[in-house]
Structure formats: structure tokens, C-alpha cells
């Protein structure tokens, strides 16, 4: 039995069985006590899969006693892109879900200087986000996966950051894995402007080739000016995604 596990040591003990192969999604264990609990919790499993290459390499380096393998996160082939795929873009930027604070500040500054910028932003309402365009037009709550993907598909540019970048998340213990949103941006034909710290996971997903990495506002502005006016290279995106479908 295959089982996804979001948080390895916060999950129930029910996955520690000889007939279960668990796959760890968010692996943030670094402390000795956390690691010992992780080993104990899955010591009966014949194989333990680690989605993050960064976390997998870390476990190999400390001689993890479990039988571990790297199984990267992927995206469904129902969204497959080919050389003839076309994208109808409506907005320069669509910001979905939780955002990196630096990229959000950069976009705010950019839109003040370039008042023709079109973008979508979200406001938290309870456990969900409600989305609005730059004029304040209410676009609704994107309550389904397809709503989410359809809105993202209308964006020319995606702003992406790994979870711990710029103190975005403090629970990752320094791990900065690539999240599914990166592949979602690619499969929806978005240019990606990114902030990340290079590690084995960002290398695995080739962020250096598939995104424009920025540090300063000036770099952000230059990237926005360029990418707002360009279509993505669908052939290159299609070739890249063939390595990352489920």
C-alpha cells in the first residue's frame, strides 16, 4: 500500500507496517530527537520515499538506517503540454495562495511605477482566499482545483519562492524544497520570476534554467518589463514537463 505522509513525525503510527510504503511530502526533521522518532515510526516499512532531493541527500549523508529512495513530486499528465498548446493570457501576474513577502512588495512597487500592470491578488477569508483584480473586481473564491488552475492559466508571469525563503515559513528547519506550485506555473504556461536558495531540490527541478532568479527590485523590474511582452517557449516547456508528469 502506498501512503502519502504530509508531516512524518506528526502523523499517526498507523503507517508503520510491512505492507505500507510511505512517501514523505514535507520532511523538516534535523534534530537528533526528531530523527530518532522518524526512524522508529517507519522502521517496519520495507521502503520509505522522500519527495525532496534536499531532504533525501541529507538523510543519506547522516546514514539514515531506513531503506530510503527519492520520489520527486510531479504533476498530473491530464494537464499535459505539447508543441501546439496555446495559452490565452489575461493578466500579467496572478498571485494564488500564500505569497513571498519580498516578491509581493516588489510587485506592489512595480505596479505603482507601471500603472498598466494587470494582476490578481487574494484576500484571506476564513480558511480560503477570495481573489480580486487590480481594479478591485471580485473574481470569486476558486473553490476547486480546476478553478485554481484555470485562473493560473490566465497569468503571463508566476512569482515563486521556496517555502523558507525570506522567513516565509519558520517550521522547515532550513529545508527549502521545491513545492508543486512551481510545476503548476510551468504547466500553465507562465514565465517564473523566483527567489530561492540553491540546493539539491532546486537543482533537480532546474530552477536555474526554468525561472528568472532575482535578488533586487531592479532585477525584478527588468524581468517584469521583459517577460510581460513575451510568450513562453512552449516547445521547451513541453520537453521539460515530460520529466515531471505522473
Go through the PLM ranges and name each one.
Residues 17-24:
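Short beta-strand/loop segments at the ligand-binding rim of alpha/beta enzyme cores
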Residues 25, 73, 214-216:
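Active-site donor-binding loop signature of nucleotide-sugar glycosyltransferases
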Residues 5-15, 30-37, 41-206:
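Nucleotide-sugar donor-binding catalytic core of glycosyltransferases
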Residues 58-59, 222-228:
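C-terminal helix of von Willebrand factor
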Residues 29-30, 219:
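Short acidic loop-to-helix transition motifs that present clustered carboxylates
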Residues 1-3:
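PLD-like (HKD) phosphodiesterase/transphosphatidyltransferase domain
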Residues 215, 225-246:
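A charged, aromatic-enriched C-terminal amphipathic alpha-helix characteristic of glycosyltransferases
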Amino acid at each position: 500500500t502506498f501512503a502519502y505522509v504530509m508531516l512524518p513525525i506528526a502523523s499517526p503510527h498507523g503507517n508503520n507496517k510491512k505492507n505500507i510504503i510511505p512517501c514523505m511530502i514535507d520532511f523538516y526533521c534535523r534534530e537528533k530527537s526528531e530523527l530518532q522518532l522518524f526512524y522508529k515510526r517507519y522502521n517496519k516499512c520495507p521502503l520509505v520515499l522522500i519527495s525532496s532531493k534536499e531532504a533525501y541527500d541529507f538523510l543519506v549523508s547522516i546514514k539514515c538506517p531506513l531503506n530510503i529512495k527519492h520520489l520527486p513530486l510531479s504533476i498530473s499528465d491530464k494537464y499535459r503540454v505539447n508543441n501546439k498548446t496555446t495559452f490565452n493570457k489575461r493578466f500579467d501576474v496572478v498571485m494564488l495562495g500564500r505569497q513571498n513577502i519580498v516578491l509581493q512588495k516588489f510587485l506592489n512597487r512595480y505596479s505603482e511605477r507601471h500603472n498598466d500592470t494587470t494582476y490578481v491578488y487574494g484576500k484571506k477569508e476564513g480558511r480560503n482566499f477570495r481573489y480580486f483584480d487590480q481594479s478591485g473586481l471580485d473574481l470569486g473564491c476558486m473553490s476547486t482545483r480546476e478553478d485554481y488552475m484555470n485562473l493560473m492559466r490566465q497569468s503571463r508571469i508566476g512569482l515563486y519562492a521556496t517555502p523558507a525563503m525570506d522567513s516565509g515559513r519558520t517550521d522547515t528547519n532550513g529545508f527549502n524544497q521545491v513545492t508543486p506550485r512551481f510545476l503548476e506555473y510551468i504547466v500553465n504556461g507562465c514565465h517564473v520570476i523566483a527567489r530561492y536558495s540553491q540546493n539539491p531540490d532546486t537543482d533537480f527541478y532546474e530552477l536555474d534554467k526554468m525561472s528568472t532568479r532575482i535578488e533586487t527590485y531592479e532585477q525584478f523590474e527588468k524581468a517584469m518589463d521583459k517577460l510581460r511582452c513575451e510568450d513562453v517557449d512552449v516547445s521547451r516547456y513541453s520537453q521539460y514537463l515530460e520529466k515531471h508528469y505522473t
